[in-house]
């Protein structure tokens, strides 16, 4: 696996852990789901925080680049989990965000 593929997979796993960690409390608070879902939510958010420490860049650069990946993964979640069709504006926004992420993440290293 190339370094770029490893970093992309790490970004995607980080985003998924954050989304699950936030979605489960949303289900409890908005959809009346059982409170025990807060336990896996907390574990997922702890996993999210730990995964952030595995990224090779400085924290601020990691967070900035991660934002683009988060947007793309959140839109995939919207389509797959929530069953909402993506608009062309959703796709355009994700492409722009991923472009910004690529500029940050793929910059020449000094």
From Swiss-Prot:
Keywords: Cell inner membrane, Cell membrane, Membrane, Transmembrane, Transmembrane helix. One of its GO terms (cellular component) is plasma membrane. Its main location: membrane. The chain crosses the membrane at residues 9-29, 34-54, 66-86, 88-108. It is a multi-pass membrane protein. It comes from the Bacteria. InterPro entries: UPF0060. It holds the Pfam family UPF0060. It is found in: Cell inner membrane. Belongs to the UPF0060 family. PANTHER family: UPF0060 MEMBRANE PROTEIN YNFA (PTHR36116:SF1). This is UPF0060 membrane protein Bcen2424_1283. The lineage of its organism: Bacteria, Pseudomonadati, Pseudomonadota, Betaproteobacteria, Burkholderiales.
